[in-house]
């Protein structure tokens, strides 16, 4: 469906059926009583709240970018799910949990790609979750440590984008410079109401 959005403008019946099936699975995974989500909530209220924030902002960004809102929302919600296992490599643990709970490949890929430790983001939604997590986490850290004063939202977001782009973070995502600029603008203007 990423190819469809970027190139053809219309979905074939097969692509539409696949998209509908994916969204059906994602809707179930996003249910408040989904077993793995309950495990996350029981494990750590702080991690649960963080994940809910990343989920909400990622969904808004995906809507702004014309991406799959449910995929970005689920990706944000489960991006650090592996932490509930206590494993030192929470990404591998998260991928394993995703497979145990029969997550769609697209969602498992976001868990694997959200921090660049294993893979670079290969979709718009994975890039969104990565940037949302980085921006929200950095902003929270600066606020808690008393270092936020004097750091404008624009400076924070631009610095994170510049740092990530200099490391080739989006080189496999298929995003154009125009899309990258639009995503950066979302975080500055819409998310932070800058």
Regions found by a protein language model. Give the residues of each.
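Acidic/His-rich, divalent-metal-binding segments that scaffold phosphate/diphosphate chemistry
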Residues: 1-92, 96, 188
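Hydrophobic faces of stable alpha-helices that mediate helix-helix packing
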Residues: 51, 104-105, 132
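Alpha-helical scaffolds flanking conserved acidic
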Residues: 67-78, 106-110, 123-128
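Soluble catalytic domains of enzymes that build or remodel membrane lipids, polysaccharides, and related
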Residues: 82, 90-117
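Short, exposed beta-strand "edge-strand" segments with a Pro/Gly-rich flavor and a Y/T-containing core
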Residues: 62-67, 97-102, 169-178
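Hydrophobic alpha-helical scaffolding
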Residues: 44-47, 97, 101, 121, ...
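Terminal helices and disordered tails flanking the catalytic cores of nucleotide-processing hydrolases
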Residues: 1, 34, 88-92, 115-194
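Conserved, well-folded catalytic cores of nucleic-acid-processing
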Residues: 61-64, 84, 100-101, 114, ...
């Amino acid at each position: 469906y990423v190819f469809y959005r970027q190139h053809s403008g219309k979905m074939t019946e097969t692509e539409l059926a696949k998209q509908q099936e994916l969204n059906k699975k994602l809707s179930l995974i996003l249910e408040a009583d989904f077993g793995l989500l309950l495990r996350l909530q029981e494990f750590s209220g702080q991690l649960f709240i963080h994940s809910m924030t990343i989920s909400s902002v990622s969904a808004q960004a995906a809507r702004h970018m014309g991406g799959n809102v449910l995929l970005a929302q689920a990706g944000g919600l489960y991006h650090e799910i592996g932490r509930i296992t206590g494993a030192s490599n929470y990404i591998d643990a998260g991928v394993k949990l995703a497979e145990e709970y029969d997550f769609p490949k697209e969602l498992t890929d976001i868990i694997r790609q959200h921090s660049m430790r294993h893979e670079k983001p290969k979709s718009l939604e994975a890039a969104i979750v990565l940037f949302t997590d980085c921006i929200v986490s950095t902003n929270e850290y600066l606020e808690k440590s008393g270092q936020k004063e004097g750091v404008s939202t624009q400076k924070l977001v631009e610095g994170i984008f510049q740092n990530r782009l200099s490391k080739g973070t989006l080189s496999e995502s298929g995003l154009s410079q125009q899309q990258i600029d639009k995503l950066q603008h979302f975080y500055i203007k819409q998310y932070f109401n800058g």
